[in-house]
Each structure stands twice: as C-alpha cells, then as structure tokens.
C-alpha cells in the first residue's frame, strides 16, 4: 500500500498553500490528545486530497497540511470527486478507491492514515447509499452505485449489503427488484429513448423499505421523466412491493452516490426531495407515518430557494421539527424557511458533501464572501451560529466534516 510519509506531505503542501495574513498563529502544530475528541476535515487542492485533523472544530486555529497534521490521501483517491464515494462511519473511513478495492481506513495518532481492512467485489464497486438509520457500529448497511438491469424481468436488481465493520465481511445481502416503466419515453426529436433506473434514496421505516428512484437516458445521459417514483415493499422480506408516483415536483432528486435526499421528521413522516428536469427547481413530497402513498395534501415548493446550489450535502434532521437542506433550515411540516445560514454567517456558501450533528448542533463548512473557509456551528434551539476553525485558503473544496472519536 502506497502511503506517503507525513513529512513529505507537509513539504509538498508548502509549495501551493498560502496563509492569510490575519490567520491564527499556528507556528507549532496543536497537540493531539490521544484519548480526547478528534475531528477531521476532508479538503482538496488542485494537487491532491488531504485529511486535516483537530481536537476541536471550534478552536481559533488554522487547519492546513503545512501547519497542522495534514494526511495526504491522494494516492488512495485518484480524483478529488471520489470523495462522494467515501463515507465516515463511527470514526472509520470507507473508500471506494478506483472501484476495484473497497477499503476501511483509520486515522492513527491524529496524523497517520492506515488501511485496516479491505474487500474486493467481483465487479467494479463504488459506494452508493448508506442506510444510516438501521446501521450500527458493528454493521454498515449500504448499496453500490449501479444495480443491474434485468430486461427479461423488466426490473432493476439493486443489492443491499450488510457489512461487518470488524472484518468487512458481508453478513447478508438483500436484492431489491425495482419494476421499470412499461412504456418507452420519447426524446425531444421524437425518437425512442433508452431509459434506465438510478436509485436516489433508500430508507427503512418500521417494516417498510422506501426506494426513491429516477430515470436517466442512456442516449442523452440526462435525467428524464418529471415524475417522482418510490418503490415500497415490506422489510426485510421485500414482499408486497408497489410503485408510488407523483408528478407535482418532478423526479426524485439526487443520484446514486451517498448524498441523502430523504429524511424522517420527529413524527416519523418521510420527506422526499424532488427536482424538475433541466432546472434547479426543488420541492418536498411527504409520506406520512404509517402510510405507503404520497400525501395528496402536501407539497413544499422550493423553486424560489437555491437549495444545493453549491453543495450536495447530506440533509440533516435537526430536531424540534427542523431540517437542514443546505444552506437553509426548514420547518417542513409547516412549509416554512426558518433560516438561511449564508446570511447568519455574514455571507458565504456551503460546499460540502458531508456535514454532521453532535450534541444537537450542526457543523458545516462555508466559504465566505471574502474567500475564506471556516467551520461553523449552528444551534437550532437559538437559531444562531458560531465561527470555528479556519481552513487554509489554498483549498478549492471541502468535502467532509467528520468526528473520528
């Protein structure tokens, strides 16, 4: 395994990272308490990808490969965008790498990167959806990005893997069969299209599985059919499956990578994000608790709000009836926008793919209007933000904010 030495990483990073003149004084790296809390920020530059660690996201410090404990992970993620095919689960990173090797990594001593396990699949494997509400510390429940179209059955066969996190063995696999449409859609020129299914969400609620999915064209490589489709079946038997659909908001938003576009509220109502083809007009549909069909009396039109403009971050349930759909805090049940975090931070944009919650507070990274990167803490109870650690201005993207321990 090719893991670069930390010293070489820091020397190489010096050439292309610059520090703001008003940045915190970080002549000496912050010591890492080996038994205390540890957090990480996954950042990329034009030349590579780095894990930056800190004992606190809210301290007045600069997170940088030059002055902090940056870990060069470029050799494991051959392109920066592959961070969307990586996930942090209970302090361990799971990486799809180049699709040939699915790896488990840990940050050791706050400054080293170690592969602790790996799993090879028979075919290319890129990490898809994570069913976080049924995953545990011992078992990660996940999918791969692309299922298999069975033309004889006219279904998409989508496996769900139950992986033992101790040794990365597969405890079991469930194969969901999602029925495809029974007609052939047309292209704009009137010719027949060639559609395929992309699962956009996987949610288990009680004894039901809900699989949001959309259609794309093999010919144009674009999203098609402005209808939200969700496959509902019994769980875990997968029996009694049916398709429910709703055209009010367009197709079920998202793609097959990890980003999460559905959420359960405090009442266990399931919300499904929708989007119009060829636009950035989003909305929310609802499947009420105990129901297996869309609520005909509910649609939250978000076309006037540029959700996900610069971010495809995970939707977070904040509690007290609120949810974070970057960059907005919403009260979905009452169809209200509670806050715009871009305004609360004083101007900026979130550009992450993975934020996280701790002790009832949201942590996300924003690039301010002054082109400075900061971690911000949002308190849903008080509707206020606090600015935390600064991230080196030499980065061009921050993908993940994670807690490692």
Predicted regions, residues:
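Bacterial Sec-dependent N-terminal signal peptides
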Residues: 1-40
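Intrinsically disordered, low-complexity segments enriched in Gly and acidic/Ser/Thr residues
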Residues: 30-34, 289-371
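Short, solvent-exposed loop/turn segments at conserved positions within beta-propeller repeat blades
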Residues: 45-50, 98-101, 150-158, 220-227, ...
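Post-signal peptide N-terminal segment of secreted/secretory-pathway proteins
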Residues: 51-162
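Beta-propeller blade signature
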Residues: 53-60, 155-169, 223-238, 282-292, ...
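Beta-propeller fold detector
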Residues: 62-77, 113-125, 169-188, 240-249, ...
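Repeated scaffold domains used in trafficking and secretory/extracellular systems
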Residues: 76-88, 122-137, 183-185, 195-201, ...
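Acidic, serine/threonine- and glycine-rich low-complexity intrinsically disordered segments
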Residues: 181-327
């Amino acid at each position: 395994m090719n893991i670069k030495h930390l010293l070489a990483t820091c020397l190489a990073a010096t050439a292309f990272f610059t520090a703001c003149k008003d940045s915190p004084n970080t002549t000496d790296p912050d010591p890492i308490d080996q038994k205390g809390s540890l957090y990480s920020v996954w950042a990329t530059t034009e030349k590579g990808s780095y894990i930056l660690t800190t004992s606190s996201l809210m301290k007045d410090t600069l997170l940088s490969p030059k002055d902090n404990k940056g870990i060069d992970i470029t050799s494991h993620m051959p392109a920066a965008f592959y961070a969307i095919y990586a996930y942090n689960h209970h302090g361990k990173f799971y990486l799809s790498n180049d699709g040939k090797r699915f790896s488990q990594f840990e940050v050791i001593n706050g400054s080293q990167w170690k592969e602790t396990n790996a799993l090879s699949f028979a075919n290319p494997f890129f990490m898809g959806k994570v069913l976080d509400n049924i995953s545990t510390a011992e078992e990660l429940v996940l999918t791969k990005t692309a299922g298999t179209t069975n033309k004889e059955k006219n279904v998409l066969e989508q496996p769900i893997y139950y992986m033992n996190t101790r040794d990365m063995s597969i405890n079991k696999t469930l194969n969901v069969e999602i029925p495809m449409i029974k007609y052939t859609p047309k292209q704009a020129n009137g010719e027949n299209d060639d559609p395929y299914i992309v699962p956009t969400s996987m949610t288990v609620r009680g004894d039901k599985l809900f699989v949001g999915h959309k259609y794309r064209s093999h010919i144009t490589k674009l999203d098609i059919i402005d209808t939200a489709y969700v496959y509902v079946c019994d769980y875990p038997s997968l029996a009694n499956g049916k398709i429910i659909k709703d055209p009010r908001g367009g197709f079920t938003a998202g793609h097959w990578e990890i980003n999460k576009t559905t959420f359960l509220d405090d009442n266990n109502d399931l919300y499904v994000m929708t989007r119009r083809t060829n636009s950035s007009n989003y909305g929310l549909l609802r499947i009420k608790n105990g129901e297996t069909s869309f609520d005909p009396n509910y649609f939250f039109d978000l076309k006037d709000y540029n959700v996900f403009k610069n971010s495809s971050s995970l939707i977070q349930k904040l509690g007290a009836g609120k949810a974070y759909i970057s960059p907005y805090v919403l009260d979905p049940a009452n169809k209200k926008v509670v806050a715009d975090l871009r305004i609360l931070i004083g101007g900026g944009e979130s550009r992450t793919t993975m934020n996280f919650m701790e002790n009832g507070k949201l942590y996300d990274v924003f690039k301010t209007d002054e082109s400075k990167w900061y971690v911000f803490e949002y308190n849903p109870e008080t509707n206020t933000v606090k600015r935390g650690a600064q991230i080196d201005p030499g980065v061009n993207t921050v993908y993940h904010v994670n807690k490692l321990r």
